[in-house]
Amino acid sequence: MTIQYENLTIRQAEAADAKQLAAWWNDGAVMAHAGFPNGLGITEEEVKKGLGGGCMVIEEEGRLIGECSYRSVGDGVAEIGIKICETDCQNRGVGRKILSMLIGWLFQNGCSKIILDTNLRNKRAQHVYESLGFRKLRINVDAWNDQLGQPQSSVDYELLPTDFNSFAM
């Protein structure tokens, strides 16, 4: 699967991407929002073994800048995730476009609902999700502990095709 819009590409992650994915996933600054302020401690070989399915990379003008994923959770529902890992690509609307590309593709390919969750502290992500039409379902207060044992809260969202505001048209 490859999705393109303007200078952005979403494509299936390949073995050649494993080195960069491992670097991002081992970077606490990149992974803190997901509960791993010390990174995952994963090897390139472990990343290679886990590739496939809905693990994708994001390119801007051919440069790897992040990753996203989706998985079917049944009944036409897909759960998605995204990380714009390169800081010089953040706060420029890239994430909103990438999400629009991925969500549009999922809706065109039979999904009837998209779900996701994000850390309650990640206000930037919440703003992006809500601008795309996601509806906040619930806040899960102190629902889990990060790798340092600190309680974390999350926000659950859902998006229906009729509510979707695409930024990749």
Where are these regions (language model features)?
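Conserved N-terminal entry element of GNAT/NAT acetyltransferase domains
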Residues: 1-16, 160-169
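Helix-loop element at the rim of GNAT/NAT acetyltransferase active sites that forms part
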Residues: 12, 23-38
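Hydrophobic pocket/interface hotspot
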Residues: 21-22, 80
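Acetyl-CoA-dependent GNAT
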Residues: 34-89, 99, 105, 160-164, ...
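Active-site acidic-Proline motif in GNAT/NAT acetyltransferases
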Residues: 86-92, 120-121
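Conserved acetyl-CoA-binding loop-helix of GNAT-fold acetyltransferases
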Residues: 91-108, 127-131
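Short glycine/proline-centered loop/turn elements that form peptide/ligand docking sites
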Residues: 95, 99, 121-125, 142-148
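Conserved catalytic-core motifs of GNAT/GCN5-like acyltransferases
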Residues: 115-118, 130, 135-153
